[in-house]
Amino acid sequence: MIGKFQVYNVVASASICIALGMDSNLIFKSLGYLKPARGRMEVLSETKNKALVIIDYAHTPAALTSALKSIQEIIGRERIITLFGCGGDRDKNKRKIMGEIANEYSDIVIVTDDNPRNEAPSNIRSEILSGCPTATEIPNRDKAIKYAVSKLQKNDLLLIAGKGHETFQAVGIETLP
């Protein structure tokens, strides 16, 4: 599991179990079987060249900062590639800030669509890009992910942020695969 928050959660859970009188040896043996919640700093795959692909729900400035700081702590990673977008009909003030955060903690930033809902996707991306003007803009999320994966080199790390394990896009009143 990746991230300090995961450690904090495990320590808190183990402490509660011990306080309830559970066998501490059994608790510590079971730690090796823990898995993160789907879509929360979830390692999707490791490529042949040892690049990692991680997905996370990070859709707020604080969550994106936390995810990227956690990723920076992974030893032996060359570059961090971050792919994300911001949802439509939501807090517009966070878009530029999230672009700035991605720009600060990433070597490559790719901005794409993420549930534009009833807003013009190009406007959402434009607001994000105002915080990371050197980012690559690829509206279609599938194409953006394929592009990001094609950029992976040995020991790189790709963070696909914002949607966690969701496999749909909310566009207007439709939910598309």
Spans of features found by a protein language model:
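C-terminal accessory "lid"/substrate-recognition subdomains
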Residues: 5-6, 35
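ATP-dependent carboxylate-amine ligase
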Residues: 12-177
